[in-house]
């Protein structure tokens, strides 16, 4: 089975470990990733605020290149890339006049037939295979953190439940993990304010880190490079603000799956994390037991 692959800028830069772990897990489940040729930046996170046509043209060109390669679907692991590609596809489907303008701008044919999928959407298709290949049950309490861009706006991304998504929970349950019940699943981490308003990111991220820790999660699991960066890289600022020493690691979902499937930590990029990935001894109780706090 093959699927188009759009790594985007983050996965070749600040989130190399996401790219490495996506590729390692897909290889293990016999899913071939065909990288979109001559791809460009999708425009996240500033293009849509600065130039509307540019914000449409950049993702449209990526999808046009995928069409030219004969691809029917494209996996965009970065949540921001997924959101921009899905939003552009929806916008150009709804406005044929604007679609023609963008086609003339990118100088490539574009029909809108290529579907855009996020990493959770793709891996859910292979949940049974992932479960079959699990050799080290991931028996930890985990906080599944979806962030803003995977599930919103719901009429555009058309994925999961916007207020209480479950796809990552199901994936992690398939490898033996116990997702906690918490209210921060889709809270904002501060996103691109990481540079200009570090104080805001420390405030928002601190709430997420504190709640996951209070509920005894062994790790926070994400599917967004920006979320991972803000909760991992900005940990010193978060700890200073809250006068704590929070050490809970922040894993990409593909890293958690990869560990359970016996893939070496080096191949999953765990050494790249700033907050050391030190997991406790796996829990021995039945994963289905629920002793989380009520609020």
Where do the model's predicted regions map?
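Iron-sulfur cluster-binding electron-transfer modules in prokaryotic oxidoreductases
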Residues: 1-295
């Amino acid at each position: 089975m093959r699927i188009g692959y759009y790594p985007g800028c983050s996965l070749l830069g600040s989130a190399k470990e996401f790219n490495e772990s996506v590729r390692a897990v897909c290889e293990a489940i016999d899913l071939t990733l065909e990288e979109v040729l001559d791809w460009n930046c999708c425009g996240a996170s500033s293009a849509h605020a600065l130039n509307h046509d540019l914000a449409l043209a950049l993702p449209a060109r990526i999808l046009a290149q995928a069409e030219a390669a004969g691809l029917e679907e494209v996996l965009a692991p970065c949540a921001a890339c997924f959101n921009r590609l899905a939003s552009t596809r929806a916008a150009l489907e709804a406005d044929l006049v604007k679609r023609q303008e963008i086609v003339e701008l990118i100088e490539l044919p574009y029909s809108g037939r290529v579907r855009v999928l996020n990493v959770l959407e793709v891996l859910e298709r292979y949940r049974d295979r992932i479960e079959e290949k699990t050799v080290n049950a991931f028996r930890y309490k985990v906080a599944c953190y979806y962030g803003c861009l995977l599930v919103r706006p719901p009429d555009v991304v058309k994925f999961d439940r916007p207020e209480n998504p479950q796809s990552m929970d199901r994936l992690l349950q398939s490898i033996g993990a116990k997702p906690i019940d918490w209210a921060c699943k889709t809270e904002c981490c501060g996103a691109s304010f990481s540079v200009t308003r570090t104080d805001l990111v420390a405030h928002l991220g601190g709430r997420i880190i504190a709640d996951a820790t209070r509920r005894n999660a062994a790790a926070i699991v994400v599917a967004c490079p920006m979320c991972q960066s803000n909760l991992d890289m900005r940990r010193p600022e978060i700890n200073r603000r809250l006068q704590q020493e929070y050490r809970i690691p922040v894993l990409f979902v593909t890293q958690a799956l990869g560990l359970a499937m016996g893939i070496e930590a080096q191949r999953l990029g765990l050494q790249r994390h700033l907050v050391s990935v030190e997991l406790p001894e796996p829990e021995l109780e039945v994963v289905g037991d629920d002793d989380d706090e009520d609020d």
